[in-house]
Amino acid sequence: MAAALIEAGFEVDDVHLSEIGSKIKDLNSYRGLVIPGGFSYGDVLGAGSGMSNTIMFNTKIRKIFSEFLSNEKNFGLGICNGCQFVSGICEIVPGAKSWPSFMRNDSDQYECRLVQLKIESCSSIFFNGMEGSVIPVSYT
């Protein structure tokens, strides 16, 4: 993920949650927060909740993330388990209270389902200029 972001022109820094909580690094010195997959707590449903619960149940860290996400100049992106993480903190993400949650499917296993996703007009830096594009996405 870091290589892709660098290739796209972003400056990248690896930051551990403990560095934010202990104020070794200041989240407000960044403009973006990208949480990739990576098998945090295993590659299973709910794996992202370990990190999201760390934020939601720690008043100090929750406030830091809430302030960062409330700044309209900042952006966030969650991929794979990172998407589960972002879903787990949606309570502090402006405009995200109605987001869907992840649930187990009937087989309790990963099942690839290919769907087409149409990009609507939006202010996302990731979809700028892609309005009307239809892209394939797999999900379980």
Where are these regions (language model features)?
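N-terminal beta1-alpha1 cap of cysteine-dependent amidohydrolase-like domains
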Residues: 1-79, 83-95, 103-112, 118
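Conserved small/polar residues in nucleotide/adenosyl-binding loops
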Residues: 140
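Conserved beta-loop-beta connector loops within the AMP-binding
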Residues: 123-134
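Sequence-level motif detector for i,i+2 pairs with an aromatic at +2
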Residues: 112-114, 132-133
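Histidine-centered catalytic micro-motifs
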Residues: 137
